[in-house]
């Protein structure tokens, strides 16, 4: 039905535009009168094929390529994703529009002191910590942040929020070998309502991922008023802006030095926070909606 039935239903209902929000379109929609748009989030399965099973890569490649070829317009969630669509699928640049994503509005306003006390007690969060949020997998590279922690004063901790995976086992082996059990806190199953407080209690946010389509956790951190240290190599500079600090994902010493710079220079930290919060405003839901609506209007001219 998703392949053939959707198009028949769209034509029956006399729909003007179909927008595929997650990388795919009905295969026959280009043969209909219905205009189509597809949003492509990333092509990580082509950029880093080693992280995917071959059958999944083949399915994704076929579906994503067909969607890009058949769509009237393509929305990429970053300039990085746009470049990948051009490189891997040979799509003309003028067919692709970049529309950045935002984050949930719960990250855009301060949590109460009572909520901070409640969350700190509930999860036994340390007084001074660097935060990492995201799925705990090889590509996300959280181990590098743990390694960098060994170069920092003992009172500084690392909190990693994410679901337990095989890669978590690798991190935990390093923690045990380096006697970091008291300084690294891996926390799973955090309710979304508690997540903004994790950010606002943190002193630094680190996102050492090797590759992302965009990087919403960075936007969450900027809105939350904490400085960001992120990896080079994909789109994270687009999310973090010019005042965050970027290091190569394998540069452990560089990451540790970035943390030290922030901790040792309160004025720089203040500037990073203030400019980061200003930069984050460009990712509002209102702006995203306006840009998508303009694409719809242009398509109907």
Task: Describe each model-derived feature in a short phrase.
Residues 1-301:
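Carbohydrate transferase catalytic cores enriched for Leloir-type hexosyltransferases
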């Amino acid at each position: 039905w998703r392949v053939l039935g959707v198009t028949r239903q769209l034509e029956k209902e006399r729909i003007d535009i179909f927008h595929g929000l997650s990388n795919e379109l009905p295969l026959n929609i280009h043969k209909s009168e219905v205009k189509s748009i597809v949003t492509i989030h990333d092509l990580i399965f082509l950029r880093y094929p080693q992280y995917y099973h071959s059958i999944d890569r083949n399915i994704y490649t076929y579906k994503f390529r067909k969607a890009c070829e058949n769509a009237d317009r393509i929305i990429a969630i970053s300039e990085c994703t746009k470049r990948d669509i051009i490189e891997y699928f040979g799509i003309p640049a003028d067919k692709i529009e970049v529309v950045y994503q935002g984050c949930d509005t719960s990250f855009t306003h301060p949590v109460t002191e009572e909520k901070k006390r409640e969350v700190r007690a509930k999860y036994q969060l340390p007084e001074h910590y660097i935060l990492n949020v995201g799925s705990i997998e090889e590509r996300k590279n959280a181990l590098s942040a743990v390694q960098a922690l060994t170069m920092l004063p003992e009172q500084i901790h690392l909190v990693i929020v994410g679901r337990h995976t095989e890669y978590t086992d690798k991190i935990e082996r390093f923690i045990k070998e380096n006697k970091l059990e008291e300084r690294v806190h891996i926390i799973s199953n955090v309710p979304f309502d508690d997540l903004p407080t994790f950010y606002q209690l943190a002193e630094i946010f680190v996102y050492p991922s090797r590759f992302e389509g965009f990087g919403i956790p960075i936007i969450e951190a900027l809105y939350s008023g904490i400085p960001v240290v992120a990896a080079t190599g994909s789109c994270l500079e687009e999310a973090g802006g010019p005042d965050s600090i970027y290091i190569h994902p394998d540069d452990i010493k560089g990451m540790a030095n970035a943390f030290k710079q922030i901790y040792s220079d309160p004025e720089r930290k203040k500037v990073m926070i203030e400019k980061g919060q200003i930069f984050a405003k460009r990712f509002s839901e209102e702006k995203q909606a306006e840009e998508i609506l303009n694409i719809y209007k242009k398509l109907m001219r």
